[in-house]
Amino acid sequence: MIYGVGTDICDIRRIAATLQRRGDRFAERVLGPREIEVFRYRRAKVEARGLSYLATRFSAKEAFSKAIGLGLHQPMSWRSCEILNAPSGQPQIHLHGALADWFAQRRLIAHVSLTDETDYATSFVVVETQGL
């Protein structure tokens, strides 16, 4: 059964401006530990790839927070939710700490889809309850 649906569109130019103003502090506030490694790796290779990565993760976390109905209120936080790619490239949501506990107690599973173009990153999340 569907528990919630969330979507978000993010202007990559706004993320770029924020990153320029605040430096890596912005990325470190939004990204979890494994995400920050990927961000730095991608940005070192091609600046635009790092920026797109940050924007898609920002967008996906916004969409996820909407799908679970919490917004960015505890136990949901930027760093407690990571969007990591499986070896196949499929994005997957990995949760940590109190958010992982909250999610497990409700027997929820999440599916995420990401896309980006030159100026925009978009995410769609469906959260469903696991069968009894």
UniProtKB/Swiss-Prot annotation:
Record: residues binding Mg(2+): D8, E62
One GO term (biological process): fatty acid biosynthetic process
Cofactor(s) listed in the protein's UniProt record: Mg(2+)
EC number annotated for this UniProt entry: 2.7.8.7
Main location: cytoplasm
Reactions listed under catalytic activity: apo-[ACP] + CoA = holo-[ACP] + adenosine 3',5'-bisphosphate + H(+)
Location in the cell: Cytoplasm
Keywords: Cytoplasm, Fatty acid biosynthesis, Fatty acid metabolism, Lipid biosynthesis, Lipid metabolism, Magnesium, Metal-binding, Transferase
Gene Ontology molecular function: any one: holo-[acyl-carrier-protein] synthase activity
Domain of life: Bacteria
GO cellular component, one term: cytoplasm
HAMAP family: AcpS
Free-text function comment from the UniProt entry: Transfers the 4'-phosphopantetheine moiety from coenzyme A to a Ser of acyl-carrier-protein.
Annotated family: Belongs to the P-Pant transferase superfamily. AcpS family.
Protein name: Holo-[acyl-carrier-protein] synthase
Originating species: Leptothrix cholodnii (strain ATCC 51168 / LMG 8142 / SP-6) (Leptothrix discophora (strain SP-6))
